[in-house]
Amino acid sequence: MNEPKRFKHESTTLEHLPNELFVDIFGYLNGVDTVYAFSYLNNRFQCLINDYVRDFDFKSVSKAKFHFITQSHQIHQWRSLCLSDGDQTPGQIKSFCQLFPLAQHIHQIRTLAVLDMTPKYAVEFLPQIESFQHLTSLSIGKVCGFNIQSIQLPSLKRLVLTSCKYTSWIMVRDFDVMLIIVNLFLF
C-alpha cells in the first residue's frame, strides 16, 4: 500500500512579491474578502492582514463568512464598518452588537454605515453612536417610523440619512463643515 503523499511547503512566486504590493492590492479589496482569502495561509499574510486591513463591508456577506471574519480579525483596529439587516443579512446588526458591544470594541471607527435596520432595534442602536468620538462619516439607511434622537458627534463631516416620511428627524448640532445628504423613500 502506498504511503499518503505529504505536502511540502514550497515557496511560490507569489510569496516573493514585496509586502508593499500586497498592501496596495488589499486597498482595492473589501476587508471581508481580503481576510477570508488570505487568512491562515502563512504568518506573513496574517501579519499583513492584521496590520493593514481596516475596512469591512458586511452588506451582502453570508452568516458563515461574517462569523469567520469577526472571530479571526482584530476588530479594535477597524476603521470602517458597514452592517446591514437586509434580505440577505437579516439580524446582522443585532448579532454584531451582541458579539461586540459598540462602545467597548469599535469606538475607533471613522466611517459607519448601518442599513435596513428594523425600527425596534434602531431605538437601541442609535443612542450608542455617540460613543464613536472619531466618527467622520455616518450613513443610516432605511430607517422608518420612529424618532431619531439627538446625537453629538464632534468629528462628523458627512451624514447620509435614508428614511421615509414617517420618521421624526435627527437634530444636528455643533457641526462646522459637514455634508448632509437626506434621501426619502415612500412606501
Regions found by a protein language model. Name each.
Residues 1-187:
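The conserved beta-strand core of Leucine-Rich Repeat
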